[in-house]
């Protein structure tokens, strides 16, 4: 009996002395689709985000694209962004190349080494993708594709990864139902997601947890085969289009900012703080606003888009 008790004590001692798996957490200040050239109150919006982040003190901040073009008119707003004292990251959106701006100019202005890159923080690997590749060599106009060269780079990043992975891109990589206006994922999203899923099966210790994007000015999250695909709403507005023209502010604003009348602006800027933990959860702080002027639905905007189009970033708790 005495030997049995001793054996039990030894087992318990071994269990208690076994190294506990370290819990890793990271907090991210996140915004998307600021669209500096579109909004007359862009300074207020970007300042609100940075001021809030100086108080929240996340591990880093990131904007998910469509921030603005390299132009002296917008230089003060880039300075506000750069006033955040911690690490900060840009993602290249499709509107970064407006006004004849080249990809190289957009990258250089932000002091980025490349439009796709990776970095580590708090035991997580963050991979930034560029959805603006050409689908074919002579493609003109709008792009939404991840090309072969970038795919090869991504495969190498996944191959050498040893930490849990979070993805950032401007255009989404989630599902695309095909209903008008619902989703605008990259054209080869299915292929890229398949690559993610193969990686998660072969290297669960460095699994891809989530992919964050902007672009659609939607508020949406979905889980596809164990990976969260999360669309962060625009800081500023929902684009409606010329058929929904409405004078949102006044004639003076409309004269100097001609695109606002085709949008449904949010009264208050939208942004969020995301926390990710290896305990198996993602949290997002919520931020709720309202429209300046009539809602999209009062102007006849398609009803089937209500589940995406909201003047808010929804508070979320997502498990993985």
Residue ranges of predicted features:
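Short acidic, glycine-rich surface-loop motifs adjacent to enzyme active sites
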Residues: 159-178
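Extended active-site neighborhood of metal-dependent phosphoesterases/phosphodiesterases
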Residues: 72-160, 191-208, 218, 222-233, ...
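N-terminal active-site segment of His-dependent metallophosphoesterases
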Residues: 17-76
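Active-site-proximal beta-strand elements of phosphoester/diester hydrolases
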Residues: 25-38, 123-133, 166-168, 227-233, ...
């Amino acid at each position: 009996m005495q030997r049995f008790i001793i054996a039990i004590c030894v087992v318990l001692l071994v269990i208690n002395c076994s190294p506990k798996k370290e819990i890793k957490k990271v907090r991210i200040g996140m915004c998307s689709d600021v669209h500096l050239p579109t909004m007359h109150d862009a300074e207020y919006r970007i300042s609100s985000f940075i001021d809030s982040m100086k108080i929240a003190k996340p591990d880093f901040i990131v904007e998910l694209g469509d921030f603005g073009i390299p132009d002296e008119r917008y230089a003060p707003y880039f300075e506000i962004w750069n006033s955040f004292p911690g690490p900060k990251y840009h993602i290249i959106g499709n509107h970064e190349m407006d006004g004849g701006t080249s990809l190289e100019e957009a990258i250089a202005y932000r002091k980025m080494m490349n439009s796709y890159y990776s970095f580590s923080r708090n035991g997580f690997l963050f991979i930034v993708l560029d959805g603006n590749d050409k689908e074919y060599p002579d493609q003109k106009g709008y792009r939404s594709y991840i090309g072969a060269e970038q795919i090869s780079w991504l495969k190498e990043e996944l191959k050498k990864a040893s930490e849990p992975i979070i993805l950032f891109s401007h255009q989404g990589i989630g599902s695309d139902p095909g209903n008008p206006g619902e989703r605008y994922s990259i054209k080869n999203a299915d292929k890229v997601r398949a690559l993610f899923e193969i990686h998660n099966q072969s290297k669960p210790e460095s699994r891809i947890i989530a992919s964050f994007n902007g672009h659609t000015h939607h508020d949406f999250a979905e889980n596809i085969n164990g990976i969260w695909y999360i669309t962060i709403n625009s800081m500023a507005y929902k684009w409606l289009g010329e058929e929904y023209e409405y004078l949102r502010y006044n004639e003076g604003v409309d004269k100097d900012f001609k695109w606002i009348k085709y949008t449904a602006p949010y009264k208050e800027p939208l942004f969020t703080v995301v926390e990710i933990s290896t305990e198996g959860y993602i949290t997002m702080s919520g931020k709720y606003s309202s429209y300046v002027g009539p809602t999209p639905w009062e102007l006849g905007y398609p009803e089937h888009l209500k589940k995406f189009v909201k003047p808010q970033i929804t508070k979320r708790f997502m498990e993985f």
